[in-house]
């Protein structure tokens, strides 16, 4: 006999129950970015996932990026994007626009989407409650001809040096869902633009989060046959980087996962944000849909 839609929904909810119990009162940090942010239907599905996590007793925290939107705004305002070693240079004028786009328009759009579900989201950035302090990023690049390393001056691109969890702990005890933009102050009074992945990792590490989810445009880490690897230890991840299985843009993503685990996160997942309800499919099903990296 074919199941009715209501019977299927009931069965799926019953299967999800043990996972709801497993993650009750646990912190899950979700880095939201990639294609999902530009798709209205995926955006609504993401917001409903976050709302359901909260309703299930989970403490969800959203960290978001916004690279394409920043680029579009800079173009609109006639400001040329400059790059050093493939990394965006953020001068004073640019960092003001970065803050406007990240902590302003994008942040509030995500907050509004979650609030439309009936939950209560609040938009923040690293400046709020002195949550995050940063310092100027120190990046180097090796000249392929001379093999000499030189230091890149990326302007107001920062790295997290301190996370104060006080505000986030207060919010965890409330009904509110934090949505955080990766902008933070330095002790020097400057404002810094921080890579959203590393920012999310720092937040998750400071909170000893049970899970950190990276929503990307790919299914996860793939083996040399192109098949999804469901779970990796840190040691196995290092080995796959060394033998070239993990390559290109996936290397910094996996390295960020490893750093987050070293900082205290219990498990980090790279998953496909282009799949509707990807967060629920990862958290509330037995095998998840991405690659789980564990200590």
From Swiss-Prot:
Molecular function in Gene Ontology: acetylglutamate kinase activity; ATP binding
Signal peptide (residue range): none
CDD domains: AAK_NAGK-C
Subcellular location(s) of the protein: Cytoplasm
Known pathway: Amino-acid biosynthesis; L-arginine biosynthesis; N(2)-acetyl-L-ornithine from L-glutamate: step 2/4
Keyword Cell inner membrane found: no
Transmembrane segments: none
Reactions catalysed according to its record: N-acetyl-L-glutamate + ATP = N-acetyl-L-glutamyl 5-phosphate + ADP
Class of this enzyme: transferase
Protein name as annotated: Acetylglutamate kinase
Organism: Rhizobium etli (strain ATCC 51251 / DSM 11541 / JCM 21823 / NBRC 15573 / CFN 42)
């Amino acid at each position: 006999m074919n199941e009715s839609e209501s019977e299927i929904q009931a069965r799926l909810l019953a299967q999800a129950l043990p996972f709801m119990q497993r993650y009750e009162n646990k912190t899950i940090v979700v880095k939201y970015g990639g294609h999902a942010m530009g798709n209205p239907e995926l955006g609504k599905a993401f917001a409903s996932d976050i709302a359901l996590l909260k309703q299930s007793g989970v403490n969800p925290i959203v960290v978001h990026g916004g690279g394409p939107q920043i680029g579009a705004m800079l173009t609109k305002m006639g400001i040329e994007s400059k790059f050093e070693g493939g990394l965006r240079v953020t001068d004073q004028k640019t960092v003001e626009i970065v803050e406007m786009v990240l902590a302003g328009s994008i942040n509030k759009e995500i907050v509004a989407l979650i609030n439309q579900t009936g939950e209560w989201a609040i938009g923040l950035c690293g400046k709020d409650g002195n949550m995050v302090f940063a310092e100027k990023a120190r990046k180097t690049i090796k000249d392929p001809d001379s093999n000499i390393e030189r230091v890149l001056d990326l302007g107001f691109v920062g790295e997290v040096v301190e996370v104060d969890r006080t505000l986030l702990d207060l919010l965890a005890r409330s009904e509110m869902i934090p949505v955080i933009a990766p902008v933070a102050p330095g002790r020097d009074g400057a404002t810094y633009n921080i890579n959203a992945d590393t920012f999310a990792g720092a937040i998750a590490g400071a909170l000893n989060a049970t899970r950190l989810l990276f929503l990307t445009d790919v299914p996860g880490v793939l083996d040399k046959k192109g098949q999804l690897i469901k779970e990796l230890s840190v040691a196995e991840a290092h080995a796959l980087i060394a033998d070239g299985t993990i390559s290109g843009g996936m290397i910094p993503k996996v390295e960020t996962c490893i750093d987050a685990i070293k900082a205290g996160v219990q498990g980090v997942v790279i998953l496909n944000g282009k799949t509707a309800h990807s967060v629920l499919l990862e958290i509330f099903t037995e095998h998840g849909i991405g690659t789980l990296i564990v200590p």
